[in-house]
């Protein structure tokens, strides 16, 4: 996402960003809007105003970690927190898309692959993953 897109997302659903710091440095974050839509479609990435605070599904748009902090469990801790928060908020579950090579990673958290996503975001083949409570 661009700086402008992230700024727009923060303005619309800042409470759906999970952040990890090392001292004063942001080292990892997970973010995504809430919606009643069951599938993660490209228009959701493009328009932060589609966020519905009372929606059934927590979407995960980004799982980001600085290179020096990768493979230390940072992203996993944030994903677990996002899952716990979605459960506590009474959501039906979470939905994300990922590349084929990461399907097994998200499966460790209980996400199930639903196959190739309708999303063509960034010109990439994405797999939709869902964790249902």
Features from the language model and the residues they span:
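Conserved GNAT acetyl-CoA-binding A-motif
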Residues: 79, 85-99
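Active-site rim helix/loop that mediates acceptor-substrate recognition in acyltransferases
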Residues: 1-23, 29-40, 44-50
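Short hydrophobic/aromatic beta-strand or adjacent loop that forms the aromatic wall/cage
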Residues: 15, 124-129
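Conserved active-site alpha-helix within GNAT-family acetyltransferase domains
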Residues: 88, 100-124
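Conserved acyl-donor/pantetheine-binding loop and adjacent beta-alpha core of acyl/acetyltransferases
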Residues: 29-64, 70, 80, 119-126
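Conserved G/P- and acidic residue-centered "switch" motifs that form tight phosphate/ATP-binding loops
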Residues: 73
């Amino acid at each position: 996402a661009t700086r402008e897109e992230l700024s727009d997302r923060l303005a619309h659903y800042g409470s759906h960003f999970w952040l990890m710091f090392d001292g004063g440095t942001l080292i990892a974050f997970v973010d995504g809007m809430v919606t009643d839509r069951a599938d993660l479609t490209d228009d959701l990435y493009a328009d932060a105003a589609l966020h519905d605070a009372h929606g059934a599904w927590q979407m995960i748009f980004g799982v980001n970690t600085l290179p020096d902090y990768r493979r230390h469990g940072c992203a996993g801790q944030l994903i677990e927190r996002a899952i716990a928060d979605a459960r506590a908020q009474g959501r039906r579950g979470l939905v994300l898309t990922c590349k084929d090579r990461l399907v097994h990673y998200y499966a460790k958290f209980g996400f199930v692959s639903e196959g190739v996503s309708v999303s063509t975001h960034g010109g990439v083949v994405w797999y939709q993953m869902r964790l249902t409570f």
